[in-house]
Amino acid sequence: MPELPEVETTKQGIKPHLEGRIITTAQVRNRKLRLPVPLNLNELCEGKHITAITRRGKYILLHMDKGYILIHLGMSGHLRIVSQTANPQKHDHVDLHINNGLALRFCDPRRFGLFIYIDENPYQHPLLAHLGPEPLSDDFNSEYLLRKAANKSQSIKSFIMDSQIVVGIGNIYAAESLFLAKIHPNTSAKKITTEEFNSLTGHIKKILESAIEAGGTTLRDFYSSDGKPGYFRFALKVYGRKNLPCLVCENKIETVVIAGRHSAFCPHCQPIIT
């Protein structure tokens, strides 16, 4: 699933082509996504100015002079900027034609994404209203996490992947951040010390910033708006490296299932706290 760096990379890629432009046509080929694409999307969007493009967590918002389009890439989706004459492929579900001869094309093979219209304040929409702070903001710090973790017996990995605690951190970047902070992913959140939270928040911020600079992580499905893969996969220390030697201590990387997700870690660098 695209995480914060992949969504931010996508936002940055489409922004120069869309911001300040006018939507001339909205073309829907398949409405059946996680939430159905509005039947009247063309009526809602035609002639609207795109005034801004922002990101909230793993969501992209197209701000128009009236209304908003909320986009989520789901498990395998991506947005591309293409010529309006480019032939659509099998999983290209929605096109927004722009008054510069280009189109924003939404592709989602597994159809877990969404492409919906919101009339009112989008930040009050149920999908956004209860999200936690952005991990790259000043609001996300060790004091905040320490306060939220009080009496939380869930694993620290599940804790930082909870979008109501902090947005945008998925399996890849949670595993990498915990490795650098030397915290076992199954450690109870309430047992993490202030010093450890200081280390963890710092590493989360650094990893996300580095991943954004590298264009995100491409393992299978993610490509940026210009069709390029993300190169942060070459910097991964533990994710996807089961049974390979740790790059720090040379012990074998192991995995443990936490909340249904395989979590990679080094048993030597990240000892479990009992």
From Swiss-Prot:
Task: Show the catalytic activity.
Answer: Hydrolysis of DNA containing ring-opened 7-methylguanine residues, releasing 2,6-diamino-4-hydroxy-5-(N-methyl)formamidopyrimidine; 2'-deoxyribonucleotide-(2'-deoxyribose 5'-phosphate)-2'-deoxyribonucleotide-DNA = a 3'-end 2'-deoxyribonucleotide-(2,3-dehydro-2,3-deoxyribose 5'-phosphate)-DNA + a 5'-end 5'-phospho-2'-deoxyribonucleoside-DNA + H(+)
> Which SUPFAM superfamilies does this one have?
Glucocorticoid receptor-like (DNA-binding domain), N-terminal domain of MutM-like DNA repair proteins, S13-like H2TH domain
* Active site, renumbered: P2, E3, K58, R261
Query: Which stretches does the record call FPG-type zinc fingers?
Result: 237-271
Which cofactors is this protein said to need? Zn(2+)
State whether keyword S-adenosyl-L-methionine applies: no
Keywords linked to the UniProt accession: DNA damage, DNA repair, DNA-binding, Glycosidase, Hydrolase, Lyase, Metal-binding, Multifunctional enzyme, Zinc, Zinc-finger
Which note does the record give on the cofactor? Answer: Binds 1 zinc ion per subunit.
Pfam families to which the protein is assigned, alphabetical? Fapy_DNA_glyco, H2TH, zf-FPG_IleRS
Where along the chain is DNA bound?
Answer: H91, R110, K152
* InterPro entries the record matches: DNA_glyclase/AP_lyase_DNA-bd, Formamido-pyr_DNA_Glyclase, FPG_cat, MutM-like_N-ter, Ribosomal_uS13-like_H2TH, Znf_DNA_glyclase/AP_lyase, Znf_FPG/IleRS
Q: Does the keyword Chaperone apply?
A: no
Q: Which GO terms describe its biological process?
A: base-excision repair
GO MF term set: 8-oxo-7,8-dihydroguanine DNA N-glycosylase activity; class I DNA-(apurinic or apyrimidinic site) endonuclease activity; damaged DNA binding; zinc ion binding
Q: EC number(s) for this protein?
A: 3.2.2.23, 4.2.99.18
Q: List the transmembrane segments.
A: none
- What does the record give as the function of this protein? Involved in base excision repair of DNA damaged by oxidation or by mutagenic agents. Acts as a DNA glycosylase that recognizes and removes damaged bases. Has a preference for oxidized purines, such as 7,8-dihydro-8-oxoguanine (8-oxoG). Has AP (apurinic/apyrimidinic) lyase activity and introduces nicks in the DNA strand. Cleaves the DNA backbone by beta-delta elimination to generate a single-strand break at the site of the removed base with both 3'- and 5'-phosphates.
**Belongs to which family?**
Belongs to the FPG family.
| Description of how the protein assembles with itself and partners | Monomer.
Full protein name: Formamidopyrimidine-DNA glycosylase
Q: Which gene encodes it?
A: mutM
